[in-house]
UniProtKB/Swiss-Prot annotation:
InterPro entries: SAM-dependent_MTases_sf, UbiG_MeTrfase
Enzyme class, spelled out: transferase
EC number in record: 2.1.1.222, 2.1.1.64
UniProt feature coiled coil, ranges: none
Function field: O-methyltransferase that catalyzes the 2 O-methylation steps in the ubiquinone biosynthetic pathway.
Alphabetical list of HAMAP family matching this protein: UbiG
Entry protein name: Ubiquinone biosynthesis O-methyltransferase
UniProt organism field: Rhizobium etli (strain CIAT 652)
Membership in a protein family: Belongs to the methyltransferase superfamily. UbiG/COQ3 family.
């Protein structure tokens, strides 16, 4: 198969999330875990971006003037708060229903986000580039991880960053992030994640490195049931985040 014929889209996954689109902004609905996860990932994005671009973390709009792509944006749970930080955000998702929900919510909230029902490869082919590419909780739902990462990397400008968050392919992750989360705790609908589609860190790092990016940070993320919060951790066996940078 030629690269031109390759696709990152898993239509079954697109249909699955489209069917739940109306629940994106419900903090007690099917996307409750993402609402819980948002504070820790937003803080990580803000802190690492500010360090890279020489910004003040305490500023109300620390990402002012930066162009950001939120790929696989869903209903916009990440796009909106990043836009509130001052960034010019493009929220991209292959689901028309997700983009419709995201656009309606952003308009009602008065937050400017450029939402588009497009794929990563369509954006890359159009020559789009960004200071920051957010690839958060997406790679475990795409059809071709290597091609997806390579495509996203193409859009990172010199000196720019790519953030990736996903679930590791380990037995520990299978037990906690799939079996417990979907069958016991009922945090997620059954079938949200499939073990064979989970991604190990090296499977992300290899295509990023091949695309000229340097991996500058790795961190685990865990849920503390006592505080009811997600926190950064050195344990990357389940949830983790990676940060890549294209040299200036």
């Amino acid at each position: 198969m030629t690269e031109g014929a390759r696709s990152t889209i898993d239509q079954g996954e697109v249909d699955r999330f489209s069917a739940m689109a109306a629940e994106w902004w419900s903090p007690t609905g099917k996307f409750k875990p993402l609402h819980k996860f948002n504070p820790v990932r937003l803080a990580y994005i803000r802190d690492k971006a500010c360090a890279n671009f020489g910004r003040d973390q305490k500023s109300p709009r620390p990402l002012e003037g930066l162009r950001v792509l939120d790929i696989g944006c869903g209903g916009g749970l990440l796009s909106e708060p990043v836009a509130r930080m001052g960034a010019s955000v493009v929220g991209a998702d292959p689901s028309d229903k997700n983009i419709g929900i995201a656009s309606t919510h952003a308009k009602a909230s008065g937050v400017p986000v450029d939402y588009r029902a497009v794929t990563a490869e369509e954006l890359a082919e159009a020559g789009e580039t960004f200071d920051i590419v957010l690839n958060m909780e997406v790679v475990e739902h795409v059809a071709d991880v290597e091609f997806f990462m390579t495509t996203c990397a193409k859009m990172v400008r010199p000196g720019g960053l790519i953030f990736v968050a996903t679930i590791n392919r380990t037995m520990k992750a299978a037990a906690l992030a799939i079996f417990a989360a979907e069958n016991i705790l009922r945090w997620l609908p059954r079938g949200t994640h499939q073990y064979e589609k989970l991604v190990r860190p090296e499977e992300l790092e290899k295509p990023l490195a091949a695309s000229g990016l340097e991996i500058t940070d790795r961190t685990g993320v865990f849920f503390n049931p006592l505080s009811n919060q997600w926190n950064l951790s050195r344990d990357m066996d389940v949830n983790y985040m990676l940060l890549g940078k294209r040299p200036a």
